[in-house]
Amino acid sequence: MADVIENSPALDVNLDEENYFDDSCHIDTPVTGKTIFCGSSKEDVEYAKVFWKSITLQPPMESRLVSGDTRQRLKVASASFQPKNFAHEPVPDSPRLTQFLEEAHRQEHVEETEKRRQLSIKKEQQQLLLQKQREERMQREEILRGHKPRQRTELIHLPTSSDEEQEEDPMLELDKFEQAKGLQDLDSD
């Protein structure tokens, strides 16, 4: 929020009532008169107005009709006058029920310990498998360290004008070969 300026007679500015309310820049308070919120948004001013309107001061103790003092409270009735409430007393359990509940509790405990044992066995198996895989990987890495692959260097062959002539030469040679073969085929008939 912006600065809060409380009006005093020295700071009282002659503003007409409409302009003063249009700015939404003030709040009337019961304690100090008017409070001006300069530079505050209208939303902040509305929140402040609601806040100041919601504040109610409690009257002094002398003017209250009822006091919170313990002397005005009613006395508590003695326990001897109250009938015994059987609804809140625990019902005694039968021996069969007690034995059944104890057995069920033991069975749950046994099942839980078995489950934990199975989980620990499974965890150990997973750790052994990871260890085995790690050892195999390390063996493969050792084998690869001893064997270094040859680096392949490929020569890039750029075509030149002599290459074009060479390409034509095989074509001519192929034509000559086909002609010679054609003559041989005719001779073989």
Curated annotation (Swiss-Prot):
It comes from the Eukaryota. Residues 144-189 are annotated as: Disordered. Residues 162-172 have a biased composition (Acidic residues). Transmembrane segments: none annotated. One of its GO terms (biological process) is cilium assembly. Residues 144-155 have a biased composition (Basic and acidic residues). Belongs to the HOATZ family. PANTHER family: CILIA- AND FLAGELLA-ASSOCIATED PROTEIN HOATZ (PTHR47231:SF1), UPF0722 PROTEIN C11ORF88 (PTHR47231). This is Cilia- and flagella-associated protein HOATZ. It comes from Branchiostoma floridae. The gene is HOATZ.
